[in-house]
Amino acid sequence: MTAANQNYGTGRRKSSSARVFIKPGNGNITINQRSLEVYFGRETARMIVRQPLELVELTDKLDLYITVKGGGISGQAGAIRHGITRALIEYDETLRPALRAAGFVTRDARRVERKKVGLHKARRRPQYSKR
């Protein structure tokens, strides 16, 4: 892949990170050498990935080459969405306000809360016995 007419964006969510390359094309989305439909079985994950492209109406005009690692399905889909958004902003800065209004530009900083000593989970306490 040549660097001449392509744009790049890095996306992160939870423990996933995605590298997204966009270039003019006809709407092919390749994730880790597999198509979007093969990589994500869940329709919700596919929908999350397509959101920024549908918002700016460039679904059929750009080809996406994506590598993603770490985390699960939801985290990877969110990381890809963040990466696509950053790549689109690099491609055309005038898209930023629309993407910002939709909330795609901001990195979702939520992480898994650590388990505390004396508790079952992060906040789940042992059952309280009055007597």
From Swiss-Prot:
* UniProt keyword annotations, A-Z: Ribonucleoprotein, Ribosomal protein
The alphabetized list of GO BP terms reads: translation
InterPro entries tied to this protein = Ribosomal_Su5_D2-typ_SF (IPR020568), Ribosomal_uS9 (IPR000754), Ribosomal_uS9_bac/plastid (IPR023035), Ribosomal_uS9_CS (IPR020574), Ribsml_uS5_D2-typ_fold_subgr (IPR014721)
Q: Which GO terms describe its molecular function?
A: RNA binding; structural constituent of ribosome
Q: Which domain of life is it from?
A: Bacteria
Q: Any coiled-coil ranges, and where?
A: none
* Gene3D superfamilies registered for this protein in UniProt: 3.30.230.10
Cellular-component GO terms for this entry:
cytosolic small ribosomal subunit
Family assignment from sequence similarity? Belongs to the universal ribosomal protein uS9 family.
NCBIfam families xref list: PRK00132.1
Protein name (Swiss-Prot/TrEMBL)? Small ribosomal subunit protein uS9
Please tell me the species this chain comes from: Glaesserella parasuis serovar 5 (strain SH0165)
The top of its lineage is: Bacteria, Pseudomonadati, Pseudomonadota, Gammaproteobacteria, Pasteurellales
